[in-house]
């Protein structure tokens, strides 16, 4: 883990190097270019994290004042790591939800779930109207409207649910 001094030096270097118009502000585009230069795995995501930590007024720019103000770098790093841990936990929850859904409804051990499998699953769980429940699920999850639900469609659906439950993430 980098020391606070290293972080301060890196931020100053970033300002000196990538504040292209020398206005004392870093835009998201400048940050993305910075991380590309550093050969970051995902420069856009790195820029987003940078802005989540340092763009205190959420105006889409990181200013020298925001960087040099009352920033507690250790606290900022801790918050960043907590957000990362929460994000990983949410990803794990999505995968658990997908697995549970597949186990409950997939009757022929392939990866797609059909309307008939949904109906059968709802019958087994005692749903009042299994066909209506199946139709609702297909309407919500079957994005390509082919009559089956794929793992990809499940993942997209459960990620949307996570975002609704955790809008600040």
Curated annotation (Swiss-Prot):
Binding annotation for Ca(2+) 1: 19, 21, 23, 25, 30
Gene3D superfamilies recorded: EF-hand
Signal peptide annotation: none
Binding sites annotated in the UniProt record for Ca(2+) 4: 142, 144, 146, 148, 153
GO molecular function list: calcium ion binding
Keyword check for Metal-binding: yes
UniProt-listed SUPFAM superfamilies: EF-hand (SSF47473)
GO-annotated biological processes: adenylate cyclase-activating G protein-coupled cAMP receptor signaling pathway; cellular response to starvation; oscillatory cAMP signaling
Domain EF-hand: from-to ranges: 6-41, 42-77, 93-128, 129-164
Binding site for Ca(2+) 2: 55, 57, 59, 61, 66
UniProt: Ca(2+) 3 binding residues: 108, 110, 112, 117
Domain of life: Eukaryota
Pfam families xrefs: EF-hand_5, EF-hand_7
UniProt keyword Zinc present: no
Keywords of this entry: Calcium, Metal-binding, Repeat
Function: May be involved in the phase-shift of cells from growth to differentiation.
Protein name (record): Calfumirin-1
Species assigned in the record: Dictyostelium discoideum
Lineage: Eukaryota, Amoebozoa, Evosea, Eumycetozoa, Dictyostelia
């Amino acid at each position: 883990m980098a020391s606070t001094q290293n972080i301060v030096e890196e931020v100053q270097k970033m300002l000196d190097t990538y504040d292209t118009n020398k206005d004392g502000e870093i835009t998201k585009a400048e940050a993305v270019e910075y991380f590309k230069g550093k050969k970051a795995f995902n420069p856009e995501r790195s820029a987003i994290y940078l802005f989540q930590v340092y763009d205190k007024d959420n105006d889409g720019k990181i200013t020298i004042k925001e960087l040099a103000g009352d920033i507690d770098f250790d606290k900022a790093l801790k918050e960043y790591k907590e957000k990362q841990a929460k994000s990983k936990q949410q990803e794990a929850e999505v995968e658990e939800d997908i697995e549970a859904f597949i186990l409950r409804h997939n009757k022929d051990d392939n990866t797609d779930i059909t309307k008939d499998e949904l109906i059968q699953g709802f019958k087994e769980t005692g749903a009042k109207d299994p066909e209506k429940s199946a139709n609702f699920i297909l309407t919500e999850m079957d994005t390509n409207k082919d009559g089956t639900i794929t793992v990809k469609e499940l993942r997209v659906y459960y990620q949307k649910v996570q975002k609704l439950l955790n809008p600040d993430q």
